[in-house]
């Protein structure tokens, strides 16, 4: 997320716009109330990277006619420009990778239940595994938060079960960090005894000390596309209905996934 924000800041700066960064999920009534002075004052447009499926901010900005682009996520609100990956496909790719390595006991430690990224990635994984012959009831799924603490607590419950998973799909790379810490605490060797895959390919994922297998998002393209969409909207250069940009993903296999060994 930090890289995305830096790239967005650069893109808008080059176009002559002043950028204000709001560190808030902005997905409840109190957040909407605190944002109103900004909306009423000088807000020309907004790039929203933390929207929930029913975000009141999205509805309010649409009602007021303020240009808005959602990145990474989508909402239930129609008529909003979005720039994201196909998260259902991304979840399926993570499941396919683990299944082809021989894993059959696969668990999902996801982010919030009210975000499209978590819901879609989980659905993609479950659907692919179902098509491959696994029952949904045999694939443990727990929604939590996009934090390492959440990944840790969810994974501790997974790994303490009678038949623990041999592979865990983490909702993002930050959750995966918690999964790895839980495995370490339980004395489980990654990837020999447990394979772990995340999403996003954060800079830390490629560290030689971590080597996290992950699904990479094209963050640079995402930032450029979102900035261009919003700038065009703010300048009145587009009047067509909402555009939904779906960007490609890439499986980056590193050191946290391996062949299942009985």
Please report, for each region that a protein language model flagged, where it lies by residue.
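Hinge/beta->alpha junction and helix N-cap segments in small-molecule ligand-binding domains
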Residues: 1-3, 21-30, 83-93, 109-156, ...
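Alpha-helical recognition/docking segments in bacterial nutrient-uptake
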Residues: 1-96, 160
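Short helix-capping segments at alpha-helix termini
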Residues: 12-15, 129-136, 161-164, 185-190
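Conserved functional loop/turn residues at catalytic and ligand-binding sites
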Residues: 42, 65, 102, 133, ...
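Periplasmic-binding protein-like
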Residues: 42-50, 107-109, 141, 162-172, ...
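Glycine-rich phosphate/diphosphate-binding loops that line cofactor/substrate pockets in enzymes
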Residues: 97-106
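Flexible loop/turn connectors
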Residues: 156-262
């Amino acid at each position: 997320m930090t890289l995305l924000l830096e790239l967005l800041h650069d893109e808008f700066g080059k176009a002559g716009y002043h950028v204000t960064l709001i560190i808030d999920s902005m997905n409840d009534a109190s957040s909407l109330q605190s944002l109103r002075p900004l909306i009423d004052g000088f807000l020309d447009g907004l790039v929203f990277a933390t929207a929930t499926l029913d975000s009141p901010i999205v509805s309010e900005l649409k009602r007021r006619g303020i240009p808005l682009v959602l990145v990474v996520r989508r909402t239930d609100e129609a008529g909003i420009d979005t720039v994201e990956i196909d998260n259902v496909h991304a979840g399926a790719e993570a499941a396919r990778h683990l299944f082809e390595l021989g894993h059959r006991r696969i668990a999902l430690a996801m982010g919030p239940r009210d975000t499209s990224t978590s819901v879609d990635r989980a659905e993609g994984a479950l659907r692919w595994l179902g098509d491959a012959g696994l029952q949904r009831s045999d694939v443990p799924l727990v929604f939590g938060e996009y934090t390492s603490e959440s990944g840790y607590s969810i994974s501790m419950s997974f790994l303490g079960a009678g038949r623990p998973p041999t592979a865990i799909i983490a909702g993002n790379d930050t959750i995966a960090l918690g999964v790895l810490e839980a495995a370490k605490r339980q004395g489980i060797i990654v990837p020999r005894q447990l394979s772990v895959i995340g999403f996003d390919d954060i800079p830390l994922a490629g560290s030689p000390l971590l080597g996290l297998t992950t699904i990479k998002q094209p963050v640079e393209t995402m930032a450029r596309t979102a900035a261009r969409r919003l700038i065009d909207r703010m300048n009145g250069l587009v009047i067509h209905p909402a555009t939904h940009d779906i960007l490609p993903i890439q499986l980056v296999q590193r050191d946290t996934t391996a062949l299942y060994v009985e």
